[in-house]
Amino acid sequence: GDVLAAKDPHGHYRPASTLKALTAITLIPKLDKKRVVRPSPEACNEEGSAVGLVPKPIYTVEDLFRALLMVSGNDAANALAEANGGMRKTLAEMNQVARRLQAYDTVAKTPSGLDRPGQRSSAYDLALIARAGLAMPGFRRYVSTKVAKFPAPKGHYEIANHNRLLGRYQGMIGVKNGWTSKALGSFVGAATRNGHTIIVVIMRHPGWFWDEVADLLDWGFAVRGKVTPVGTLVPPLSETPSPSPAPVQALPAAPAAPAVPPAAQAPAPAVRSSGERSPMAFAVPAAGGALALVGLLAAYRLRR
């Protein structure tokens, strides 16, 4: 996919719960969605956002993925990691998947996205991760579900997707939002119109970002094919025709960035080292197909 606009796309930021997208694309191919899981008390008592798990064998893997991607359950993230053989194994596999996607800015330290020293991602990498997820029917189904029934010890209750644009923005597919006091607001999402998909990523946003996401998507659909791309999303390593060289964090400056809407213009200089002083980083990749996400060749290729 072509990158239509970007600010500090490889800057390192805390991903918060957007990292759950990486958890999902790592585990969806591995876990039987009908398998019944009994979460540990430790998983059920994880801090932060939770779906409300109890240590009883009443949940399927499918239930846990809904809880992970719809309501950002940190308890569900840990329960899925347990079902996969444990935290250490799951984190190692998440980082392997990131390397395969050439998401070299990303280091996962938790399956939930809760802040940990050294955990990081970038707007560019979250776009790579979202693209990989959208190619998975299961992932696409989970992130686009508005409301679902969730098991309880006696019966069930309803959970509703945290994506405020789902069902309100034309063509919105979904993906994942996140927030912590250190990461601030983050979002990676996708919308499809007339067979074309736009992915938008915002990181370290200080406030309400939903209107800005809608503005960015509007702009992306309006200018697609009319502006010179500033880069392109690299393919996964398995799709590259020859072995990739040792990864480097290349971020060539585009000679002329395309015009962007006011919502896409960051008010402060980007700081690539930690992201602490940059209030926003985003990338707007475009693709030619809703599933394959293939775009035109970019004028400036971001090589790693």
Locate the predicted segments by residue.
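Domain-terminus/edge residues, biased toward the C-terminal soluble/receptor-binding domains
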Residues: 104, 111, 115-304
